[in-house]
Swiss-Prot record:
GO terms for molecular function: DNA-binding transcription factor activity, RNA polymerase II-specific; sequence-specific DNA binding; zinc ion binding. The lineage of its organism: Eukaryota, Fungi, Dikarya, Ascomycota, Pezizomycotina. GO terms for cellular component: nucleus. Residues 689-703, 726-736 have a biased composition (Polar residues). The gene is acu-15. Positive regulator of acetate induction. The glutamine-rich domain might function in activating gene expression. It holds the Pfam family Zn_clus. This is Transcriptional activator protein acu-15. It comes from the Eukaryota.
Length: 926
């Protein structure tokens, strides 16, 4: 009935279709759709039939997909509840700590009741005496112990590291290996490359330079708008067209500094190329340091950015002093309204100055030194919220309404830097001894929090469940949040280990929470593959944050939720700083292991059977990387070829060839087994011969295959090398894999050489069916004659890489099936080689024949019509070792009859594969 809700409606999976949980009896018996309206469904109402629903179903009331979706939702909710429970436990633990401290503090500060209200009234500007503490500047000087020693103040984190060391000693732990000078690049920065950059790297590759320019203007320029993008791109176009024509030192300095900054912040920097770029901009910058121009100041600011990321603090202070003096000389600190410049010049001057101010504040905090730009001297206005493309000398061009600009992130950072400047002046003055109060710190934190909360929505990083949200599309919002937490750490860090005692616990909690957020932000940037494009050294700030987290764990119980959370974060810090090979990473890991459980890196597991190719488990020899291989064909792309006897070397062929070459006696049981295998092979050959038609497409397909014939190591060579490692003695030399073994008949022959034998063997089987002994003798004589012909046509190189006994052990392992071969190659009991025949001799020297290119015995008439054609003939050219597919049979006047090789041609392999074909051995684990 209309207006009456139906029964329970369920949805199947994620689709839009829905149905009721159970149909009525009539609809179910007639197998028609029931809408489930109660008390009577539409189908029953149309015919006037009583609608009844009886619960006689033997099947499930709900579909399986619906139940599984409910189970998945339950699991997700359980996981979310566990996270929230851990988070609440952590918050409760912190609240308990704060409530205990607040209760003790209120009781001690409670005034007597008899005191009049007028007498207990305090001046709001005067902090309580018990909230004030005195800070004594550290007398530590770093470097050599003479007048050349240099100073690092408390804002650098050096004093906190000393405090952390004392705290560990107070807890009864040994600190003999704790060297504070191992951190913060106190010993200086390492050179980018120990090798001298070649002259060819003076001009970077186009791919490298394009990527660096793109990264710089996407990641760095929005926060540090020191360059005018259109003007720089015009210079870059000139550089790309002809690098030798760029002679201007300002242009060269800007170009190579952009390459260096962007390249250094990439995930895997090319240090040798960066060293070449660093050499170029050093030379160009030194040539223009005395020029009092805006271009020189822009170059100096770029150098400051590079030195900050590079942690080259010596050059940083040197370049900053010149840059600040030059900005004063150019009048950038003054109000720009006083000057009659064009709009583009005015905006450029504002952007350059405030970028310099930001770098001055952060570099002063890093080095622990006073700022060089004093706030009372700064009267410059902030730049307008307009991007470079919309600013000209004549004025501003309209932009899209409601669309956020790129420079908006820089404006937010400039305002945050003003607060950082106040923090440095009030919390870290240059005085030797000064007083600080918790009220003063809270006031600065309030101003900082107001700035952070008033950020535009596209620049605000939201935290969900105490973790940064992952719905970010760029690095600007995470980096602005990083600046906020870094400044918050600087505000509260002096209170740690001060004379406040337990009253400093809120400050420690603020520092630890901010350190936790910074580590999470760096993790977010790495997970999203975004650059750490900020004026801080990532390793230094992570190590200081990790020490703050370790400092907090010293006062926690072993089952504390906060301690477990800090342990995870410290392990993340260890992984990141170890990956970038930062100075002090090993010392930090050792110190962290004293306080928390540090996860050790998992050792590399032993090699396992390869699923696709052994190259994934075995490194390629250096000499083999550039040489082609005649059988370099992707095995995975040709599954049918392994099952065709004419296109692969079967086990029987290997046995016959082995018996011929090694002169071994064949037992009757062995001969009977060979005869059965030959009969089966003969049947397969006859069935395939009926479908053979022509050889027309061989040249075209071979040319398609030829570009993919360059690989590193064939399956036969991998098996041979693996067996050598288990069966050879200590006096035997390592097999030379730089060439394919073309051994003489006295030496063992690899499976690659024997690929041309099956066709001759199979033709003899088709034409001359003989008794067992005669057939085998005829095959052996045919193989011997073919080898003698090959020896005449192609002189063979003697190989000493593998002894006869070892090759015999490998071939004999084929009789045991895949398990035996796997054991021979990947481990297990060593294969016992058979008795070495007298014909197998080892030679300690490799030598070619006296006349290796003698073709006197070669005759084209030998290639008569109907003669079997070898599947692959090796070229003995020194330039390449590849199949002779370059010369088709038609060009040599050869007639292959009606033989059709279309179904046996190798398919074109992918260019990125390094797999090889070992014919006939796919079933044996290779």
């Amino acid at each position: 009935m209309p207006g009456i809700l139906p029964m329970k409606v369920i949805k199947v999976g994620n689709s839009s279709q829905s149905r009721i949980a159970q149909a009525c009896d009539r609809c179910r018996s007639k197998k028609i759709r029931c809408d489930g309206i109660r008390p009577c469904c539409s189908q029953c109402a149309n015919v006037g039939f009583e609608c009844k629903t009886s619960d006689k179903l033997s099947r499930r009331a709900f579909p399986r997909g619906y139940t599984e979706s409910l189970e998945e939702r339950v699991r997700a909710l359980e996981a979310e509840i566990r996270e929230l429970k851990d988070l609440l436990d952590e918050k409760d633990e912190k609240l308990d700590m704060l409530s205990k401290m607040h209760s003790n503090r209120s009781r001690s500060a409670e005034p007597p009741r008899s005191t009049p209200a007028a007498e207990i009234k305090r001046d709001s500007g005067t902090p309580a005496k018990e909230d004030t503490f005195r800070v004594q500047a550290s007398p530590l000087l770093l470097g050599v112990e003479n007048s050349d020693s240099y100073f690092m103040g408390a804002s650098s984190g050096r004093s906190f590291i000393e405090t952390f060391k004392r705290k560990i000693q107070e807890n009864g732990k040994s600190c003999t290996d704790f060297n504070p000078e191992a951190f913060l690049h106190i010993q200086g920065c390492y050179p980018l490359s120990t090798k001298l950059a070649p002259q060819s790297m003076r001009i970077p590759p186009r791919l490298f330079s394009d990527r660096c320019v793109n990264v710089y203007f996407q990641e760095w320029a929005p926060l540090f708008p020191v360059l005018h993008k259109p003007a720089f791109l015009r210079v870059y176009e000139e550089f790309v067209a002809d690098p030798e024509k760029i002679k201007n030192n300002h242009k060269l300095t800007q170009l190579y500094l952009v390459f260096s900054i962007a390249g250094l912040s990439s995930e895997q920097p090319d240090f040798q190329q960066l060293a070449a770029c660093e050499t170029q901009w050093h030379k160009s910058l030194e040539a223009v340091l005395m020029d009092n121009t805006m271009l020189t100041l822009q170059c100096l600011i770029l150098a400051l950015m590079y030195c900050t990321v590079r942690a080259d603090y010596k050059r940083l202070q040197y370049y900053k002093g010149i840059a600040v003096g030059l900005s004063h000389r150019l009048g950038l600190h003054q109000s720009q309204k006083r000057f009659s410049f064009g709009a583009l010049t005015i905006e450029t001057r504002k952007k350059v100055f405030w970028t310099l101010y930001t770098l001055d504040c952060f570099s002063a905090a890093i080095l622990g030194l006073p700022k060089l730009l004093k706030d009372e001297d700064v009267h410059a206005e902030f730049p307008s919220d307009t991007d470079d493309e919309n600013v000209t000398e004549k004025g501003f061009q309209p932009s899209l309404p409601g669309e956020p600009t790129r420079i908006s992130s820089a404006l937010a950072l400039f305002r945050g830097s003003r607060i950082l400047g106040k923090v440095l002046e009030k919390i870290y003055p240059a005085a030797t001894s000064y007083e600080l109060s918790l009220q003063q710190m809270s006031s600065l934190e309030g101003e900082l929090t107001e700035w952070f909360e008033n950020l535009p929505q596209h620049l605000k990083l939201n935290f969900k469940q105490d973790k940064p949200s992952t719905d970010v599309t760029g690095s600007r919002s995470p980096l602005l949040a990083l600046a906020y937490y870094y400044t918050r750490i600087l505000i509260y860090r002096p209170a740690i280990a001060s004379s406040l005692g337990p009253k400093a616990a809120p400050a420690l909690m603020s520092v630890a929470e901010s350190s936790k957020s910074i580590v999470q932000i760096v993790q977010l940037l790495e997970e999203r593959s975004m650059s750490f494009s900020f004026c801080l050294n990532k390793a230094d700030i992570l190590i200081v944050c990790g020490m703050a987290l370790l400092y907090q764990t010293l006062g926690l119980k072993h089952d504390s939720k906060v301690l477990k959370d800090n342990e995870k974060l410290v392990n993340s810090v260890v992984k990141i700083v170890t990956k970038v090979n930062a100075p002090g990473s090993y010392d930090f890991k050792r110190i962290a292991g004293m306080l928390v459980t540090v996860e050790e890196s998992l050792p590399q597991s032993l090699p396992t059977p390869p699923r696709q190719s052994p190259e994934a488990c075995m490194p390629t020899p250096p000499a083999q990387q550039g040489s082609p291989s005649p059988s370099a064909v992707d095995r995975g792309a040709q599954p049918n070829l392994a099952r065709q006897s004419s296109a692969s070397l079967s086990e029987t062929d290997l046995i016959v060839q082995r018996d011929k070459l090694l002169g071994m006696a064949v037992t009757p049981q062995h001969q009977q087994y060979q005869h059965q295998q030959l009969q089966q092979q003969h049947k397969n050959e006859l069935s395939r011969a009926r479908s053979q038609t022509s050889f027309d497409n061989l040249r075209q397909k071979a040319q398609q295959m030829r570009p993919h014939h360059r690989h590193s190591l064939s399956h036969a060579q991998v098996a041979q090398a693996a067996l050598m490692g288990r069966t050879s003695t200590g006096t035997q030399s390592t097999p030379n894999l730089d060439y394919l073994s073309l051994s003489s008949p006295q030496s063992p022959v690899s499976p690659v050489q024997m690929r041309s034998q099956p066709h001759q063997l199979q033709q003899q089987q088709q034409q001359q069916p003989q008794p067992q002994q005669q057939q085998q003798q005829h095959q052996r004589s045919s193989i011997a004659s073919s080898h003698s012909q090959q020896g005449q046509m192609f002189p063979q190189k003697t190989s000493t890489g593998m002894s006869t006994a070892e090759w015999e052990a490998l071939v004999r392992s084929l009789d045991g099936g895949p398990v035996s071969l796997y054991t021979a190659i990947y481990g297990g009991p060593a294969l016992a080689p058979l008795e070495t025949p007298s014909s197998a001799t080892q030679s300690s020297a490799t030598a070619w024949g006296q006349d290796p290119w003698d073709m006197s015995s070669f005759n084209l008439g030998d290639f008569v019509p109907g003669a079997p054609t070898a599947q692959s003939v090796l070229s003995l050219s020194e330039e390449s070792i590849s199949s002779c597919d370059d010369v088709p049979s038609s060009d040599m006047g050869l007639n292959n009859g009606n033989m059709d090789y279309r179904n046996t041609l190798l398919p074109v392999t992918s260019a990125g594969t390094n797999n090889f074909l070992l014919d006939g051995l796919h079933g044996y684990g290779l």
